[in-house]
Amino acid sequence: MKAVCPGSFDPITLGHLDIVTRAAAQFSEVTILVTANPNKNSGLFTVAERMDLIRESTAHLDNVKVDTWASLLVDYTTEHGIGALVKGLRSSLDYEYELPMAQMNRRLTGVDTFFLLTDEKYGYVSSTLCKEVARFGGDVSGLLPEVVAKAVTEKYSNQH
């Protein structure tokens, strides 16, 4: 079965990468789908930059690909024959946010959502938190893939 891991991934974190790696072990193909989040401001990275960083960060995973989509997620799953969505959960707050969307997606097309619990070492890690730390010169190594940490640091150095 093919699966999709949707998100804004601005930027992809080691927590995201952990979820994708675990999903890749369970599904024949996993697409990391970079989506626009209407609740978030325009990102640190363009969609194209995010996709490049994700490709570099997942190059070791043969059954993982990267794509983008700007419409209903279930339209993508239908168009590409994908039967599963994979979402990582850090806390009950993530569950409360994701549950209604999972139920609506199932109602619309029958696609199932699989929730994977985040590894405890990444339970507090978010793209937003990593950007905040990096913006003020903090160390984001160990939170982001190495190539991503370098790109984030460079972005913020160029803004000062």
From Swiss-Prot:
ATP binds at residues 8-9, 16, 88-90, 98, 122-128. It is found in: Cytoplasm. GO terms for biological process: coenzyme A biosynthetic process. Keywords: ATP-binding, Coenzyme A biosynthesis, Cytoplasm, Magnesium, Nucleotide-binding, Nucleotidyltransferase, Transferase. The record marks 16 as: Transition state stabilizer. Pfam families: CTP_transf_like (PF01467). Substrate binds at residues 8, 40, 73, 87. GO terms for cellular component: cytoplasm. Pathway: Cofactor biosynthesis; coenzyme A biosynthesis; CoA from (R)-pantothenate: step 4/5. Its cofactor is Mg(2+). It catalyses: (R)-4'-phosphopantetheine + ATP + H(+) = 3'-dephospho-CoA + diphosphate. Its EC number is 2.7.7.3. GO terms for molecular function: ATP binding; pantetheine-phosphate adenylyltransferase activity. The keyword tRNA processing does not apply. It comes from the Bacteria. The keyword Transferase applies. InterPro entries: Cyt_trans-like (IPR004821), PPAT (IPR001980), Rossmann-like_a/b/a_fold (IPR014729). Reversibly transfers an adenylyl group from ATP to 4'-phosphopantetheine, yielding dephospho-CoA (dPCoA) and pyrophosphate. Belongs to the bacterial CoaD family. Homohexamer. This is Phosphopantetheine adenylyltransferase.
